[in-house]
Amino acid sequence: LTRLGLNIHMTHNNINTEEVNCFGQDVKFELAAPNLWWVHNTFDDDTLKWMQSIYVNLDNKFEVTRPERRLLLADGADNRTLQEIGRMLVPSLEKMLDLKLNLMISKFWLDLPYFGCQPHGDSSEIIVTLQIYVDVKHIEDHQLRMYGAEFMHVDPLIEAPIIENCGYLNLNTDQKIHQVTWGCGTRQSVTFQYNLATDN
């Protein structure tokens, strides 16, 4: 995959970010199951640090979403940058998946303690979802730890790596059932959802 750059100068919480990039040079995709990949080392350090600062930037606002205990970044400068990053990822994803894609939406989620999500399948309109955990605060190896998305279309189910700068890429043509088990801690993630481009 090629590295795509998005040159933006931003100031947030007295931290200057000269450049926010898309996929970092060390990104790795590991096939976990049919049409599902674990993603490792997704973004470079500057981009990751910027993403980790979103929830402490006092210029940002969050909305309460359903299910409860999940906050969604509302519109603003950081949200607009996130949308642009989602668009800049398209060429690499198209090359990997051999599909023509259109960004539907980019999201930043802050999951609070005891957030969980019941088994569900994504809308058939969503063809590709890329979710990356940018920060996780919990006690590892504890029964009440935070969990990554758990995909239930294989037996036993498999869990996306709940590690900073890692996550999953889901080709949703088979509408996999997945869930999030609740735990104690907080979890920040960015999610990019794509549908098929109209010229497909």
Q: Can you say where each PLM-predicted feature lies in the sequence?
A:
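Intrinsically disordered, low-complexity cationic segments
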Residues: I8-T11, P119
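Non-heme Fe(II)/2-oxoglutarate
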Residues: H12-L97
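Short, Lys/Arg-enriched N-terminal segments with co-localized hydrophobic residues
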Residues: L1-H9
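General helical structural elements
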Residues: N7, L73-A74, T191
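Catalytic core of non-heme Fe(II) oxygenases with the double-stranded beta-helix
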Residues: S92-N200
